[in-house]
Structures are given as C-alpha cells and as structure tokens.
C-alpha cells in the first residue's frame, strides 16, 4: 500500500510538470486600466513616461461624506518637484482637493510612493492656494538617498493650444495610469479660472494633481478636473507660486476682479484684427467696473496683446513678486480698452491693490469660506444671510482661539 501511495504521488507530480502553463511570461495579462494602454502605444512614449512616473505619488486624505454621514478616505495624485539632501526633505505638488470644503485641513495627509519602504508617510501641508487649486506638501525623505539614480524631471515651457500631452496618475494601490490628449482651443469652463486651459481627455477619479508631460518628457503642467471637465495649470505658474511662498511666505497677485478669454479664440473674423483679452466677467463695484470696463470689452495690459492666458498669469505674478520685494505698493496698469461692437478705443490707468492667494493651516470653517468665495466668483452672488453667518462664525472662531491663547 505504501508503494502504491508513493507511485500515485510521483504520478501527480509528473502530471503537473507536463500540464500546460496557464501564465506564460510572454502572455499579456489582463489590463487593469484599458485607457492607459490606449494612451501609451509607442515604446518611446512608454520609456519617456516611466522616467516621470518614478516621481508620481498617491496622496490620501480624510473627508466627510455627506451622503454616508461619515469620514472616508479619498485619493488624488501628486508629484515630487524638489528634494533637499541636506535637510532630508522632499516637496510634493498636488491639487487643493485635500483641503476642499468637505475635507478637514487639520486631518493628516499621507504620501504613498513605491520607493519608500515605510510608505505611506505623513505629509506636512506647507500652503494651499484655492485660487490656483494647488497645495504644497513636504515629507521627511531625501529622494536621492532612497534612489540615487533617479533624476527629478525637468519643467518645460507653457502648454500651447493644439499641443499633444500626457498626464499621469496613481490610484490607492499605486497602479500607474496615463491619459493622452490635445489641449483644446475652447474657452474656460465654469469650474476653472482664466489661466487654466482645457484638454480633451477624461481624468481618472484619482487623477487631479498629476503631472502633465509633453512629447519631450518635460513637465508642463498639473492636471485639474471638475464637473467632468479636465484642465491644466501651467507648471510655470505653480513654480512661481512656490518660489514666492518659499521666499516671502505669501503669494501676491494684483486684485483685478476680472476674468478673461483670449481674443484669438474668437470664431469671428474680427478676432484676427483685435489684440488683447476679452473681458468675460467684471465684478460690480470693482475698480475696473468704476472705470467703465464691461463684459465684452477687449483690453490689453501694458502692451500685452496676444499673450496666452497662462503666460499672462505669470506676468501678473511678476507684479506680485515686485510688490513683495518692495518695488510696488499697488499694481498700476496702462490699459487700452476697445469696444468689440463699436470699435471705440480708449486708454485708462488701472490701479489695484494686491491680494494674498495662499493659505496656511486651513481648518474646515476657513476652507468653507474660501469655497464659498470661489462659488460666488464663478456662479454669482449667494444669499447675504449665508455670507453674514459664515463671517460671524469665522470671527467667533478667531475670538475663541485668542482667548484660548491667553488662557494657555
């Protein structure tokens, strides 16, 4: 009986050796994200994107789900933009989803990176800008000590209309996803500001905050999405904000209280002979409104006529930098204003103050206030009672913190 059992075991072992293999190295495994395979076809594109992908991370944060009435963990994407070898710290750029109106900005934010053995690691929020929809995080990691052979990707120039670009994202399992598309010659959607440009791919749910890469492998922007629309923030704008905050602790921008469109994107033949920016919106009671600037006017700032809006935004930030350096107390622009219908031109001086478009250490109430301000900017006025109640709560919160500080 023992001999028979030994023979049966040997028979089963040999049978398994001769069985057909179900998983061969040459077989294509089932794709988790078919859109990624469709986006990256050429081998050169794959190699190029993988070099950037080394620095793409997943960012997790807690937020309150109104429908389920409980805290949940959400994910977005970020990417490493710098590493400090001396202080052993790295900075990560991501979107402002981590401090949205539903998120508690005082809750912990975690960074998931495939090269960190103790991943996830808690990230420190340095600042957030609701205006530019960016957030800067810091982690106690020296990238070059973890992976000495890695080189942080270079930053490219402004993304251009009609340009083909890729974007990268990582989900909660660190699975890499890619999308490919073309920058659209469409005007900005309701969820985005003048300096954002639209793109024709759809981002995955975790794709906001990921890098946008051109065909040369340079990072040219950061991905944003809202209401099913994908957009790009120019990397030059993000870096300008980071440099300004690093050196001065603030991000100064002229308070124009206007939104613009590029006149070159007009479908009408007159778009070719007019130079400047179309005023898409001007706030009532603003300085521009008092000077007679209205929706539909075509204006140029200090001779800037045909500048793409992302480049124009950097021009405005250069005024903010000069202000922080003590060169300007206010922003003084020389405008040429054209009436689109009547072709009437006039020259005026627009003098406006600066605003700080960065926030540090937001709590849930302050984030709600900023969200309400963004809602008002995009969709119009909200009930005055709501604004008054929120302001009262903010003042009460400040008073309580002051009293608590005195007691302590």
Each PLM stretch: what is its role?
Residues 2-19, 23-29, 45, 215, ...:
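C-terminal cap/linker of serine protease catalytic domains
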Residues 2-12, 16-19, 98, 110-117, ...:
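Short glycine/Trp-rich loop-beta-loop segment that forms part of the substrate-binding cleft
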Residues 6, 18-35, 48-55, 75, ...:
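Catalytic-histidine neighborhood of serine endopeptidases
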Residues 57-59, 78, 90, 94, ...:
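Terminal peptide-recognition signature
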Residues 77, 201-211, 261-301, 305-307:
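PDZ/PDZ-like domain segments forming the peptide/carboxylate-binding groove
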Residues 88-93, 216-220, 224, 288-316:
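Conserved PDZ fold ligand-binding element
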Residues 101, 127, 146-195, 204, ...:
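Flexible, gly/ser-rich surface segments that form the specificity/activation loops bordering the active-site cleft
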Residues 145, 151, 332-392, 399-408:
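C-terminal, low-ordered peptide segments at domain boundaries
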């Amino acid at each position: 009986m023992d001999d028979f059992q030994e023979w049966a075991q040997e028979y089963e072992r040999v049978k398994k050796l001769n069985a057909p293999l179900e998983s061969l190295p040459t077989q294509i495994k089932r794709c988790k994200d078919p859109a990624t395979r469709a986006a990256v076809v050429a081998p050169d594109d794959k190699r190029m994107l993988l070099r950037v992908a080394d620095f793409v991370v997943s960012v997790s944060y807690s937020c309150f789900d109104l429908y389920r009435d409980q805290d949940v963990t959400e994910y977005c994407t970020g990417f490493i933009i710098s590493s400090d070898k001396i202080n052993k710290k790295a900075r990560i750029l991501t979107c402002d989803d981590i401090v949205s109106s539903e998120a508690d900005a005082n809750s912990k934010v975690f960074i998931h990176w495939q090269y960190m053995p103790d991943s996830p690691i808690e990230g420190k929020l340095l600042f957030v800008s609701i205006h530019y929809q960016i957030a800067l995080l810091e982690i106690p990691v020296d990238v070059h000590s973890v992976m000495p052979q890695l080189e942080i990707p270079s930053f490219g120039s402004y993304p251009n209309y009609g340009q083909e670009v890729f974007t990268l994202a990582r989900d909660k399992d660190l699975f890499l996803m890619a999308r490919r598309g073309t920058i659209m010659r469409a005007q900005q959607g309701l969820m985005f500001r003048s300096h954002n440009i639209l793109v024709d791919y759809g981002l995955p749910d975790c794709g906001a905050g990921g890098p946008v890469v051109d065909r040369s492998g340079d990072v040219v922007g950061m991905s944003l999405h809202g209401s099913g629309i994908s957009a790009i923030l120019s990397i030059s704008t993000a870096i300008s904000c980071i440099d300004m905050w690093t050196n001065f602790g603030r991000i100064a921008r002229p308070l124009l209280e206007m939104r613009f469109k590029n006149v070159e994107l007009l479908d009408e033949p007159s778009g070719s002979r007019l130079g400047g920016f179309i005023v898409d919106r001007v706030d009532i009671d603003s300085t521009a409104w008092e000077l007679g600037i209205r929706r539909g006017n075509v204006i140029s700032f200090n001779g800037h006529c045909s500048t793409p809006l992302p480049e124009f935004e950097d021009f405005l930030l250069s005024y903010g930098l000069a202000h922080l350096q003590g060169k300007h107390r206010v922003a003084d622009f020389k405008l040429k204003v054209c009436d689109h219908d009547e072709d009437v031109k006039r020259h005026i001086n627009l003098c406006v103050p600066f605003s700080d478009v960065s926030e540090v250490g937001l709590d849930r109430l302050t984030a709600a206030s900023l969200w309400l301000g963004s809602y008002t900017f995009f969709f119009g006025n909200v009930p005055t009672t709501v604004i008054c109640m929120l302001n009262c709560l903010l003042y009460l919160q400040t008073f309580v913190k002051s009293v608590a500080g005195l007691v302590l």
